[in-house]
Amino acid sequence: MAGHSKWSQIKRSKAVVDAKRGAVFTRLAREISVAARSGGDPNGNFQLRTAINKAKAARMPAANIERAIAKGSGHDQHGACQLEAIRYEGYGPGGVAVLIEALTDNRNRTAADLRLTFNKHGGKLGESGCVAYLFEQRSEVYLSAQSAQDGGKVSEDALLENLLELEADGYQLIDDGGAVVYGPFQALEGLQAGLRDQGWIIEGWEHCWRPLTTISQADQKSEDQCLQLLDALDELDDVHHISSNLES
């Protein structure tokens, strides 16, 4: 019985991992399909090229990637993709601003799911434009510690020297030894290409909404409520990316 119990536990654990991987693949496929609406050739479509690279980094099967491209470009048997990218905005506990990027084939369903989640966790889904002015669109490039020559972590001096040659306006060293490089919205492709040419190993890159300023909560309970809201929103199938001005 002990062996059976252990095997059951392993199967349950594997099922959880498989479910999480499946959810990631679903989100990535949606992102690829939406990007492919502007053209199915990644060589001439930076958004699609970025989405494909993210999918490959997550070890998404090539067949899944091809199906998502075909769906978005209208080359599969079901015709063009009906997904659309929509931005939603709202407030969390304590007035924290929340900006959500969703990929959906049903606006009403997505809005209802978001409203229910906000209400359940002490927040409120707002009108378009209610918090967007508190954020700006930015470029972020993630560097691997594997590209470093300084004991397994990115050398700050070497990075700073290299960034002077690129259209970067900031960076942050992270705990795993890597780094994040920041730049203007339009600089994303040039940043990742320039850093790669300089010998850095690129783990990923993306456009993100980042808060102009952050706010802190009055107590730990309020902060925990905000984090629970953000986690619950992130679990929704249609949610692609979440940004907030909660101080981390």
Curated annotation (Swiss-Prot):
Database matches in Pfam families: TACO1_YebC_N (PF20772), Transcrip_reg (PF01709)
GO molecular function: DNA binding
Family, as annotated: Belongs to the TACO1 family.
Compartment annotation: Cytoplasm
Entry GO CC: cytosol
Protein name: Probable transcriptional regulatory protein P9303_05381
A GO BP entry: regulation of DNA-templated transcription
Domain of life: Bacteria
Chief place of localization: cytoplasm
Lineage start: Bacteria, Bacillati, Cyanobacteriota, Cyanophyceae, Synechococcales
The UniProt record lists the keyword Nucleotide-binding: no
Key words of the record: Cytoplasm, DNA-binding, Transcription, Transcription regulation
Species in which this protein is naturally found: Prochlorococcus marinus (strain MIT 9303)
